[in-house]
């Protein structure tokens, strides 16, 4: 998946050490409390081929296809029950 596709998913860019002049960053999306999607650091990406992981799972749950992640996020978003 490309970096542009990561942005289209609504993931936000997080700089790692911007105050130290480091250009490293990753993307994150907190869908709900306890369910976070995260990418690898840009320095680990080869050929603009990004992955999206479900944060803090064992074993790792990883997606490489934009349409799959987009579909999953759409389904999960529709299933969110508001407490208000």
What is each PLM-predicted segment?
Residues 70-73, 77:
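Residue-level detector of alpha-helical secondary structure
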Residues 16-67:
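Acidic, low-complexity, intrinsically disordered interaction modules
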Residues 1-15:
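Amphipathic alpha-helical segments
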Residues 2, 66-69:
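Short amphipathic alpha-helical segments that mediate assembly, nucleic-acid/protein binding
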Residues 1, 78-84:
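Short intrinsically disordered terminal tails
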